[in-house]
Every structure is written in structure tokens, then in C-alpha cells.
């Protein structure tokens, strides 16, 4: 099954977020596995807070276990305990086997376990100051 999974977040609060609004915040190289879903995703310490964001879980399966496809589930999320800020840049989720997504190359299809480090992703954040 393998390939690795990712959690991403979109801070857009007006309208529906597009695929370009999501930034990967955590990756689990050993996801998914057979059996109950018990995977953990460490969060970056500098993840900006938000009241009403959209998060996504994505998975690009290993070539040995599927056709050219990817899976993505979105859900409403809230981040507390941080400061107000805006993520600058960051890596986008892998969109594979879908219109406008990346293509497989000589090394096979792109997977989270080969294109991202395991665990919380490093984020560059512009912190917002209040007067």
C-alpha cells in the first residue's frame, strides 16, 4: 500500500479553497497500512492559528498496489495555541493521476515517502503584529 500520507492546510476563509491553497504540514512515511488507522502526524511548532481552516489528508499509493490515482479527504479544522501569521511558500500536496497534477517520471510516481521528510514539515511564517 505504502507511498506515505500527508496532512495539509488551507488558510483561505472566504470561498472554497483550491488545490493551490493547501500547504503540507506533516507527513507519515509509513501510512497507510492494513488494519485500523492509527497513524500520527506531528505538527510544526510554528503552525499559525486559525479559527476556520480546511485541512486535507492525501495519499499517493505505491505503484505495486494501485492504478495511477491519489486519494484526498478534506475536513474543517481549527488551530489553537499559536500566533497569528501567514505561511510563506511551503510545499504543495502531491496531486497525481488527476487533471493538472504531476506525472510519474523515470523514478516512478511521486510519493510522500520519497519527496518529503517524515514528520512535521519546516514552515516559514510571516507573523502578524497587532498595534
Language model region names:
Residues 2-3, 49-51:
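Short, well-ordered loop/turn elements at secondary-structure boundaries
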Residues 51-63, 74:
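Internal, hydrophobic beta-strand segments that form the core of beta-sheet-rich folds
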Residues 1-6, 10-40, 65-131:
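Peripheral, solvent-exposed domain-edge segments
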Residues 32-34, 46-50:
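Surface-exposed coil/turn segments at beta-strand junctions on protein surfaces, enriched
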Amino acid at each position: 500500500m505504502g507511498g506515505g500520507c500527508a496532512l495539509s492546510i488551507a488558510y483561505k476563509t472566504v470561498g472554497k479553497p483550491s488545490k493551490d491553497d493547501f500547504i503540507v504540514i506533516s507527513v507519515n512515511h509509513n501510512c497507510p497500512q492494513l488494519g485500523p488507522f492509527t497513524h500520527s502526524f506531528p505538527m510544526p511548532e510554528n503552525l499559525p492559528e486559525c479559527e476556520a481552516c480546511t485541512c486535507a489528508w492525501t495519499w499517493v499509493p505505491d505503484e505495486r498496489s494501485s492504478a495511477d490515482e491519489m486519494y484526498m479527504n478534506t475536513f474543517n479544522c481549527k488551530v489553537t495555541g499559536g500566533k497569528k501569521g501567514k505561511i510563506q511558500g511551503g510545499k504543495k500536496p502531491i496531486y497525481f493521476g488527476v487533471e493538472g497534477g504531476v506525472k510519474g517520471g523515470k523514478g516512478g510516481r511521486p510519493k510522500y515517502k520519497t519527496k518529503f521528510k517524515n514528520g512535521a514539515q519546516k514552515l516559514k511564517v510571516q507573523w502578524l503584529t497587532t498595534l
